Each structure stands twice: as structure tokens, then as C-alpha cells.
């Protein structure tokens, strides 16, 4: 498979029938649909993330279950549920759908996306997951208040004001532990921090396992960076490290490929070759980690094509029922598993145009 320079002029109907032929009538999964999404002017950042999330099965199932509930006031989640439902209930197995309602709502809700410029797929993913979680938490809060009002218990003290966990958290949320050890008294203090995705630095000719190991490297705090130890009641040299305490059901890994270059006064792309395996086991876990021995399978990759954050293009590769598909806006193609290697990045020239993995989605086997 090569870079698809002529993808935009492909006939949609021909593309759809070719995909059915490539998969084969006998192999085509029952109740599965492969639909491209129309680009409404540089909305590939959005289309690529939506396709990746659609093929994260737990996420898709919860969005469709939300659609099945009683009619709610329109918000970003209802628009997403309508889009997913539209794909899942199509009579045809393959085709193209315009996510017009979702894009309109997105632009209405956030000024950052209310234009026709290229946006960052990771920023969009972050915004979408947090917005959905906020909507679900607000709905739960309203349900509780309505229940109290109905039962005449409005004066009951609130159990706690901490927002309830939603299915977004159940799927994507993990926990990091920031451990700091004072080198004078050996006291270890730790602070937990939740995440919906992990952002990791990239280096040339490495792997995701290496990037994650670097993420947890021990850092020495000395000189002006000394740590205030509450046991010693003074600033002391210390060692600091980050550990994974709780692993999520779906691990979303963001590769930090855009770096600000002082001499250029702008961000440039690090097209480094970073190998991401089809199977991943995490080793950088804390001593009190929950489910520390967990195996993950790669289910989707959002790929950035181009040389910079504000130009270029996003596509997505997904695994569905044992085979791999490439989604490039309205184009959908079946690809060989070996073709995934083309999206690792380049072995030379950091700013050269490339198609490289940007957001990886790994799903736990348990």
C-alpha cells in the first residue's frame, strides 16, 4: 500500500463495492458496517478520532445504549449517538455518511473547532471524552436531584460532592502514582493522578515500550530543584518517578510528535520511527498496582500525515474482526497487517513529510 495521493478523486460507489469484494461475502462480519465520513473542510482530525472510537467496542456499545434511552436535549453526546446509530443501522454494509449534525454541534460548542482550519486530533479526543463525561455526570446529578424532589428529601445532606464515575471513566481512566523519595530520611510520599490518555515523549528508532519506560524513569531533584520534605521540614535532594497504579480497559497513548523549536519560533513534527506492537504489556507499574499484569491488543491508530501540526492530514487504521481497515475520510480500504509498519515513522530527517502513528488505542484482553 502506498500513500494515497489520488484518494480524493476515487469514486465513492466504486470504493465501497471494492471494499466488499476485498473482504469477501463469506468473511464480511455479521451486523458490522464500514462507512467513511464526509470531510466538511479540514475535519479529518475529527473523522479520524470518531472512526477510532467507533471501533473501540466498549465505547461504541455505551454510545449506542445512550441513544436507546429516552429522548434528551441535543448536546454533543446525543449528536455522536445519532451518528453511531446511523452507521450501525445502515442497510448497506459499506458506504459514506456525512457527520454534519455532529460537526455543527462541535463548532457551536467550542470556538477552537469553529473554523475550517486543521486542528489537533489529540486535543479533539481530549475535549470529546471530557465533554461526554461532563454530560453524563450532569445527567446523573439531575436524576438524583429529581429523585430527592419526588421523595421530598431535598433537605437530606449530600453524601459527597465528588462527581460520579461514568462509563467514559470505566473505559479510559487509569491512575498514575507520582512517587517522591527523600534522599535524606528515605521517606516516600506519593500522589495519585487520574488520566484518560497518556502522552509520551518520542525518540528516534525506538518503540512504544521504550517510550513508556522513559516515561517512568527516575529523576533526581537537586540544586534549585530540591524537594521540600515534610518529615525533615526542609528542602532536600530527592528522587521522583511516575508509575502506573491502575491500568484502563482501553489505553489511549498519545505520541508527542509536535515540538516547539525556539530557533524557528514554531512547532515542527518529529517524524521519528517509533514501533508500536500489535500486542502490548505494561511493565512500569507501582508496587501497589491494581491488575499490574495486563495484556493489550492494538485496535486503532490515528495517523498524522504531513510535516507540521497545522497542515497535513489525519487518517485512521482499525482492527475489526481480525482484519485491518484504513479510513481516510470518505475512503475505506482493507489493508494487510504488514502495512501497519508504514505508519511507524521515518528513520531520518525530523521534519520530513511522513505518515506516522499519533494516537494509539490498546484494548485490554480481560
UniProtKB/Swiss-Prot annotation:
One of its GO terms (molecular function) is cysteine-type deubiquitinase activity. Coiled coil: none annotated. Keywords: Behavior, Cytoplasm, Hydrolase, Metal-binding, Protease, Thiol protease, Ubl conjugation pathway, Zinc. Activated by interaction with WDR48. GO terms for cellular component: cytoplasm; cytosol; glutamatergic synapse; nucleus. It is found in: Cytoplasm. The keyword Zinc applies. Its EC number is 3.4.19.12. Residues 35-365 form the USP domain. Zn(2+) binds at residues 182, 185, 229, 232. SUPFAM superfamilies: Cysteine proteinases (SSF54001). It comes from the Eukaryota. The keyword Disulfide bond does not apply. Broadly expressed. It is an enzyme of class 3 (hydrolase). Interacts with WDR48. Interacts with WDR20. Interacts with DMWD. Component of the USP46/WDR20/WDR48 deubiquitinating complex. Deubiquitinating enzyme that plays a role in behavior, possibly by regulating GABA action. May act by mediating the deubiquitination of GAD1/GAD67. Has almost no deubiquitinating activity by itself and requires the interaction with WDR48 to have a high activity. Not involved in deubiquitination of monoubiquitinated FANCD2. This is Ubiquitin carboxyl-terminal hydrolase 46. It comes from Homo sapiens.
